[in-house]
């Protein structure tokens, strides 16, 4: 069992969903990114998704896009992220996932990417713009290092496509709550319950719900049989930090 799955199963055994904050590398700025990540780790994060800044983040809403733009202008890049993770390996209790777009990973080279990610204590990757049909080379490189390539599914993902993902997926399944870009939303979209149920019928892996979560009450809007094993929150956290509040305060809402 991949460590990411272990983290989620342990949280569920304790009677709660696992908590997965998303933090763009270099946000709020280079000086405070790592202390903020450690604060998330110390205050209940089971897994932390680190966003790799990219110039054309097609799946991200304005909050994450702006965080990415600022990080890039501050000189944050994939090579530096991996190097700093290697320097801090073993300090973070949470599972670590890199979430980013294909181009920087492709330019870095899959074999070296997987090796350097393993040296940095990374347990999984999420690549929103990587088609399943083209995922083989990256999946094989990551698998050699014991790193999961986490599948994404959404309202438009067919049962056949889910079955393909289920054959090779590891760690957890990222369930996209709505089609479109990331960002806070007031209510959980009506189709989420259907998507969750369909995914639950196909996958044995834990299901993590993301894209738009703002507060714990949104999970309670879902029927019990459609609630996720883990909650991913990105834009809500970035907005909270941008307003000058602490990661500790944000995590306290979800406990």
UniProtKB/Swiss-Prot annotation:
PROSITE patterns: TRP_SYNTHASE_ALPHA. InterPro entries: Aldolase_TIM, RibuloseP-bd_barrel, Trp_synthase_alpha_AS, Trp_synthase_suA. One of its GO terms (molecular function) is tryptophan synthase activity. It holds the Pfam family Trp_syntA. It is an enzyme of class 4 (lyase). Its EC number is 4.2.1.20. It comes from the Bacteria. The active site is at residues 49, 60. It catalyses: (1S,2R)-1-C-(indol-3-yl)glycerol 3-phosphate + L-serine = D-glyceraldehyde 3-phosphate + L-tryptophan + H2O. Pathway: Amino-acid biosynthesis; L-tryptophan biosynthesis; L-tryptophan from chorismate: step 5/5. GO terms for cellular component: cytosol. Keywords: Amino-acid biosynthesis, Aromatic amino acid biosynthesis, Lyase, Tryptophan biosynthesis. The alpha subunit is responsible for the aldol cleavage of indoleglycerol phosphate to indole and glyceraldehyde 3-phosphate. Tetramer of two alpha and two beta chains. Belongs to the TrpA family. This is Tryptophan synthase alpha chain. The gene is trpA.
């Amino acid at each position: 069992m991949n460590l990411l799955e272990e983290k989620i199963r342990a949280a569920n055994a304790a009677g709660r969903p696992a908590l997965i904050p998303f933090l763009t590398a270099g946000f709020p700025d280079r000086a405070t990114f790592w202390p903020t990540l450690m604060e998330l780790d110390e205050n209940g994060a089971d897994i932390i998704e680190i966003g790799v800044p990219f110039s054309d983040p097609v799946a991200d809403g304005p909050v994450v896009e702006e965080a990415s733009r600022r990080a890039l202008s501050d000189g944050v890049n994939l090579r530096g992220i991996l190097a700093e993770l290697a320097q801090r390996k073993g300090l973070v209790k949470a599972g670590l996932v890199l979430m980013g777009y294909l181009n920087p990973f492709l330019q870095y080279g899959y074999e070296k990417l997987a090796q350097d990610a393993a040296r940095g204590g990374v347990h999984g990757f999420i690549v929103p713009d990587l088609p399943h049909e083209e995922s083989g080379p990256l999946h094989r490189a990551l698998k050699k290092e014991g790193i999961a390539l986490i599948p994404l599914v959404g309202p438009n993902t067919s049962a056949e496509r889910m079955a393909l993902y289920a054959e090779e997926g590891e760690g957890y399944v990222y369930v996209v709550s709505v089609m479109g870009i990331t960002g806070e939303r007031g209510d959980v979209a009506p189709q989420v319950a259907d998507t969750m149920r369909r995914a639950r019928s196909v996958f044995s892996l834990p299901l993590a719900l993301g894209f738009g979560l703002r507060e714990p009450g949104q999970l309670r809007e879902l029927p019990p049989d459609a609630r996720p094993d883990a909650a991913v929150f990105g834009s809500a956290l970035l907005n909270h930090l941008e307003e000058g509040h602490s990661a500790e305060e944000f995590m306290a809402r979800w406990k």
